[in-house]
Amino acid sequence: MPRSVATLRWAVMLALGATLVTGCTEAPTAPPPGAPTSASPSPGPSLAAVGADCRPAATQGLTLRLVNAAGHSISAVDLGSGPIGVVLAHQSDASLCQWLPYGQVLAAKGYRVLAFDFAGYGSSSVPQQKTYVDDLRTAVAYLRDRGTPRVVIIGASMGATMSVVAAAAITPPVDGVIALSPPVTFDGVNAEKAAPSLKCPALYVAGDADGDYAVYAKAINQATPADLRDLLVVSSPQHGIQFVAADTPASGQVRSAVESFLVAHLRTSPSATPSNK
C-alpha cells in the first residue's frame, strides 16, 4: 500500500431527504445496474438502492463519496462536528449501516464521526484488489483536512484488524485505535505483525466465549508496545459491533471502556497536533 496520504476528491450532499446508495448487506456484492464501478465514480450518491435500515440514521449527517489513492469510490456518512473525531470501520458481513446508531451516540457526545464502506462493501465501488488500509487512510485524511485534527479509529472484527494495521501506517499517527474482536489476520492483512509499529494507544476487546477471538486479541495486544496497549476480555459470546449495539452487561462494560478511552485520548491536551494528513 502507498504510505503517502490519499488525495481526496469528494462530493457532499446534504442528507436531509437524501439517502445512501446502500443496503445493509452481509457480504460484498456488485453494485446495482447503473451504479459506478470504475475508478472514476460519479460525484455524488445515487438513489438506486436505498437501504431502509440506513435511511433514518444517514439523514442525520452528510452522505459522501470519497476517492482513495487507487481511485476507488468510498461511500461514507459524516455525523457531528468539531475538532475531535472517530472513524468507524465495519465488519465483513456488513456495511457502514451497522455503525450509524452508535455513530449518532458519539456525535451527540461531541465527536465528529465518519462511518464508511470499505471498497467492495456496501455502496463503495468493487475493486479488483481490496484496499483496506488505503480506505482507512482516506477516511482519516478527510476528517483532518476539514477541521478535525484529532482522530481515533474504531473497528469491528474485520474492521478491527484493518484499523490496527492502518493506525500503524498513518502519519502523523492517529490518537488511538480500538479493535473490537480483531482476528489476527483477515484477507492477508496481519494485525499482529503491524502492532509493534503502533505509535498510538490501542485498546483490544474480545469476548471469552466468542471462539478464539480472545486468543487473537491477546496475541495482538502482546505484540503492541507495552506502554501503548490495553486489553479487555469480557465474559460474553458477543462479537464486534454487538459490543456497542446490544443491551447486555458485557456491552455496557465495553461501551464504558470505549468512551473512557475516547475521553482520555481525544479530550486531553495532545502532545502534538497533526499538521497534515
What kind of feature is each model-predicted range?
Residues L198, Y204-A206:
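Short beta-strand/loop motif that positions the catalytic acidic residue
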Residues V105-S123:
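Conserved alpha/beta-hydrolase
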